[in-house]
Amino acid sequence: MWERKEGDMPTRIAIACDDIGFERKEELKRYLVEEKGAEIVFDPVTCPEEGVNTFARLADDMAEVIQRDVCRLGIYVCGTGIGFTCQINKHWGIRAVQVSDPYSAKRARLSNNAQVIGLGMRVNGLPAMEM
């Protein structure tokens, strides 16, 4: 989706998850930092237990981080990605979508300027890094 060029500032990204998405979030974080040169500026869930029943609070917190221009992009990983995207879309100026394939993720960003994607571990069999 985006490639970092020599001399570019790293893309700043917010990332969060619930207990279901914790392992995939950690994989994504490593991929984004090591392969894409991104900077993770919001990552409040440090163990699976911290993600239990927290999607609404995490959506509100991520929306605030984006609204304050700490970063412009966010990723949330949970069971379906639906509840989180519904909650974060309640915030002014936030455009979030639940995606289940790389093409939809790309079109959401290019056609709709989506800032946040929700990934569902229980509904998405594709490797999330492809998105």
Across the structure, where does each feature detected by a protein language model lie?
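Short, Lys/Arg-enriched N-terminal segments with co-localized hydrophobic residues
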Residues: 1-8
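C-terminal binding/interaction regions
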Residues: 14-23, 102-131
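Short, conserved beta-strand edge motifs with alternating hydrophobic and charged residues
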Residues: 16, 41-45, 74-78
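Short, solvent-exposed amphipathic alpha-helices that sit
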Residues: 23-37
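A short beta-strand-loop structural module common to alpha/beta enzyme folds
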Residues: 39-53
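Short hydrophobic/aromatic-enriched beta-strand-loop microsegments
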Residues: 40-41, 94-101
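Helix-adjacent hinge/juxtasegments
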Residues: 58-97
